[in-house]
Amino acid sequence: MRIAVDAMGGDYAPEEIIKGALLAHRQLRVGIALVGRPDSLKPFLPQPLPAGITIVPAEEDVGMAEEPLMVRKKPKASINISMQQVRSNQADAVVAAGNTGAAMAAAYLNLGRLAGIDRPAIGALLPTLKGKPVLLLDVGANVDCRPRFLEQFARMGSLYCQCVLGIEKPRVGLLNIGEEPNKGNDLALATHQRLAQLPGIHFAGNAEGRDVLTGEFDVVVCDGFVGNALLKFAESVGQVITQVLREELPRGWRGKLGCWLLRPNLKQVKRRMDYVEYGGALLLGVNGICVITHGSSKAPMVYHAIRLAKEAAEQKILQRLQAEMVDPREPESNPRRRTRPLQVYSGSGPEVLPLGSLERTSSRCPEPVEDAQP
């Protein structure tokens, strides 16, 4: 198992990215390909390199503030080289921190979409009261959606829960403002009708915002605009509760004693609510395993992102998606079975990324400048 890691992406790159990658290498026993400028990476790496760690050179990187389409203007950027590691079968998955739009664009340009998928979706795992995660998608890849897109999100999410989380019959919910089938806007109404008639998934009806973290649903689908707002709100909940406990519990000698007695329990509460434990979000619908994590990721979150990528690769989620995502209701001649351009939103509005438009000098990735020591 080998994971390609864009070591130049994120606010704390490359130091924190490398720390997390080295931790994953030691604890998960997985090979790591660190992609970036060698002169920037080497100061943070042990010498000689541990067995299983390689450096793959990249001349450029795409910054957090740059437009997603910079991946097309920078064909030798680390995010592109990382995706090409997967495309050429030199890596089983890729982990990228930093510019989410750039990571999505690079994945599409280098890996392409799966047949039967109109729009890839970003799926994030969130903690629930029942101790099992819920998969929320889309959380930012598509701010405007059609009912057909949400139907595909539901199918991909259900397959992920079956393959990776081991849930035999995942309960799929549609995020809405009410439980009744006649609630919601035009998108919600049309999507509800499609999901209710969709074979192969267990559609459990509408999910209100208060239902997402209860554990009643295994998959919750929505458009990327709503999903991204909900994701960031959910991530803040744990931080707010932790901060309130830190401020209120130590007040007075009784509070200090209570803190000492409850310390193991409080640590467990923090662990259950900490989004860092879930590592990142999977980009489902592209022809490769890609995990996108926060631009503010430090070593622990990078470690968990690599763990998430490893689990997805081991459970062969990509092969299941490749085999089952083509809609049997659509004839072979339907253009939706073939790859079409993808819109990526930038500061100047939506722009089209045609597959294959990225300049490539070779069909293979650069060879590592330093191989692992035997």
From Swiss-Prot:
Skewed-composition ranges (Basic and acidic residues): 326-335
One GO MF term attached to the UniProt entry: phosphate:acyl-[acyl carrier protein] acyltransferase activity
A Pfam family matched in the record: FA_synthesis
Keywords: Cytoplasm, Lipid biosynthesis, Lipid metabolism, Phospholipid biosynthesis, Phospholipid metabolism, Transferase
Region ranges (Disordered): 323-374
InterPro entries: FA_synthesis, Phospholipid_synth_PlsX-like
Enzyme class: transferase
Pathway info: Lipid metabolism; phospholipid metabolism
Domain of life, source organism: Bacteria
Reactions that this protein is recorded to catalyse: a fatty acyl-[ACP] + phosphate = an acyl phosphate + holo-[ACP]
GO biological process terms held by the UniProt record: fatty acid biosynthetic process; phospholipid biosynthetic process
GO CC aspect terms: cytoplasm
EC numbers for this chain: 2.3.1.274
Compartment(s): Cytoplasm
Summary of the function given for this chain in its UniProt record: Catalyzes the reversible formation of acyl-phosphate (acyl-PO(4)) from acyl-[acyl-carrier-protein] (acyl-ACP). This enzyme utilizes acyl-ACP as fatty acyl donor, but not acyl-CoA.
Subunit structure: Homodimer. Probably interacts with PlsY.
UniProt record similarity statement: Belongs to the PlsX family.
UniProt protein name: Phosphate acyltransferase
Lineage per the UniProt record: Bacteria, Bacillati, Cyanobacteriota, Cyanophyceae, Synechococcales
Name of encoding gene: plsX
